[in-house]
């Protein structure tokens, strides 16, 4: 068990899954993930959520170690996604079915010295989600909110993997997150205990501010993401020329090769930066599939409030810009640059003026 200290009477009993390669069977997690669970020891004992079925034995070992022959009185179920609910079926509380309590907004559970206040958080990011505020030690048990990828045994900066987690897991539900943040703003919070990632104790305003920015679909950084989907490398060559020009102008720029790089990280950067340039090759009368996949993901996650430039490549009938524009148009508050670039198979000197005009426009 990770040596995570919360308090004398609130214990961490979660587990790391350092060997997991894909979270939700789609998101690369090179440093694994943690499944967090907590135990409140008081006159009444409460277990806060279970963990994924991959870690059943380890979790029960952690639980038994802290219980020391005591028997839990309550199991709090904040979120029914299987990575947190898989072990409810094995949790032996006598007469559990008859003792199920459906709680409502603002209701409290008296454990003795500790009191849990229940706060509903529907669609953050599942319909049934709730969070709990422990009034004595002023701890917010935030369910998947404020979570991040990465096992706790792997020490790393919070923001990058928390951002990638947020925009790919929770990002579609900005409005419900805003509602939860408003509720949380009325509480005196000293610690945040999520179901994934580290316990947050210091400088909580930093983490809350990030969630305010992310959930309101503001751009976290002024800058440009250049995203390329190139078949034979020629479209990528042009995209990298654009990257160089932007850097020469002092613009903060990120580049992603959609054919090779982590798509979830590309989605993260698309939301992070204020502007984006898409460089896509024409394919089968449309746009090359990695770009199409990327734009579908942005549609589903609520991409909005951005400026986007378009670059296409096509040998006979370039159509990528039209397809990309058609996919962007339904998105909310997207400004598409008037200047576009069309490459016929390979870059030629005559293309440079159009590239320069697009870069100038995206910079202003």
Predicted segments with their positions:
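Metallo-beta-lactamase
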Residues: 4-8, 89-129, 173-179
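Short acidic active-site motifs
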Residues: 87, 262-266
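Active-site neighborhood of phospho(di)ester-bond hydrolases with catalytic His/Asp-centered motifs
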Residues: 48-50, 72-80, 89-91, 140-144, ...
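Conserved beta-strand hairpin/beta-sheet module of binuclear metal-dependent hydrolase folds
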Residues: 3-63, 131-134, 138-142, 235
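Metal-dependent catalytic neighborhoods of phosphoester/phosphodiester hydrolases
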Residues: 86-91, 204-205, 324
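Active-site metal-binding motif and surrounding structural segment of the metallo-beta-lactamase
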Residues: 43, 54-91
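Short, charged N-terminal beta->alpha structural module
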Residues: 227-249
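FMN-binding flavodoxin-like domain, especially the glycine-rich phosphate-binding loop
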Residues: 152-192, 196-199, 219, 241-256, ...
């Amino acid at each position: 068990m990770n040596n995570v200290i919360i308090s004398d009477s609130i214990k961490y009993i979660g587990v790391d899954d350092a060997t997991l390669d894909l979270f939700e069977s789609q998101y690369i997690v090179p440093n694994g993930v943690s499944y967090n669970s907590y135990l409140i020891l008081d006159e009444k004992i409460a277990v806060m959520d279970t963990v994924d079925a991959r870690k059943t034995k380890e979790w029960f070992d952690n639980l038994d170690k802290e219980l020391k022959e005591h028997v839990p009185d309550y199991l709090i179920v904040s979120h029914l996604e299987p990575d947190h609910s898989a072990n409810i079926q094995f949790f032996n509380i006598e007469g559990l079915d008859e003792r199920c309590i459906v709680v409502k907004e603002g209701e409290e559970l008296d454990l003795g010295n500790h009191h849990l206040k229940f706060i509903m958080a529907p669609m953050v990011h599942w319909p049934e989600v709730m969070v709990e505020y422990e009034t004595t030690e002023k701890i917010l048990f935030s369910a998947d909110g404020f979570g991040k990828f990465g096992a706790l045994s792997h020490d790393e900066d919070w923001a990058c993997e928390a951002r990638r987690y947020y925009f790919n897991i929770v990002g579609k539900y900005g409005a419900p997150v805003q509602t939860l943040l408003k509720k949380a703003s009325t509480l005196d919070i000293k610690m945040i205990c999520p179901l994934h990632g580290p316990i947050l104790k210091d400088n909580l305003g930093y983490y809350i501010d990030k969630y305010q920015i992310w959930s309101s679909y503001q751009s976290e950084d002024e800058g440009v993401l250049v995203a390329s989907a190139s078949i034979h490398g020629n479209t990528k060559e042009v995209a990298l020329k654009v990257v160089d020009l932007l850097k020469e102008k002092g613009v903060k720029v990120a580049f992603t090769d959609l054919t090779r790089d982590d798509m979830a990280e590309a989605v993260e950067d698309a939301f992070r930066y204020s502007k984006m340039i898409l460089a896509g090759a024409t394919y089968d009368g449309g746009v090359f599939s990695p770009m199409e996949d990327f734009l579908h993901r942005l549609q589903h996650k609520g991409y909005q409030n951005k400026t986007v430039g378009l670059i296409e490549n096509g040998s006979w009938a370039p159509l990528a810009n039209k397809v990309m524009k058609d996919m962007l148009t339904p998105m909310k508050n997207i400004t598409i640059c008037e200047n576009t670039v069309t490459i016929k198979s390979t870059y030629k000197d005559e293309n440079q003026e159009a590239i320069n005009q697009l870069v100038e426009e995206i910079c202003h």
